[in-house]
Amino acid sequence: MPLKDALLSDVCISTSAAPTYLPAHFFQTKDEATGKTRDFNLIDGGVSANNPTLLTINQITRKMIVDKQDLFTGGPTDYDKFLVISLGTGSAKNAAMYTAKDAAGWGILSWLHSKEGYTPIVDMFSYSSAALVDYNVSILFQALHSEKNYLRIQDDSLKGTAATVDVATKENMEELVRIGEGMLAKTVSRVDMETGKPVPVPEEGTNADALTRFAKKLSDERKARMTSSQGKPSSAL
């Protein structure tokens, strides 16, 4: 569909245009064959899906149902055949930035921008949106005994400049790379169904170990598909 064939640069700028931080983005696509154009006026995709994991799973499931493709031996809702890696962009959730006593005296401006430089209402909506999806997806996979097929890597302990979304200095970029690389050495964690908080799962090793296992599964699946005489996949998507 030519009118949906947007430049990747426009897509990236649009989905990063967080309200109050960065400006909304406009671009236009054109169907050269018909001359028709389509205008896009967009802001950060996180406004509707700050954690797009569940949306992605739904889209894949929908595609399998619509296309009637037999990519699952047990049907499109057989989650044992899904491998999901969810990479968070970090948050400052663990930092005690606000208290009910403080918020009780806030007016409109304080909710939008605190004296410490944070945006309380935006931070709260963003975190709750992402955390709820992580909780729901994690519980879904656990309930279906496929918890090892879902890997969430997220740092909720960001502080200072690293916790901002609009500081693109060389120093901050290098710090974020350091934090990201450090996450590989951390123990795999999974949401506790009672508390809703992530807890370490030592027996599954580090995030790097889990990624290696995922990579092997995908590699084995690709080899199986390529050698299948019928051209049908055997397991994971």
Regions found by a protein language model. Give the residues of each.
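Conserved catalytic cores and adjacent C-terminal regulatory segments
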Residues: 1-237
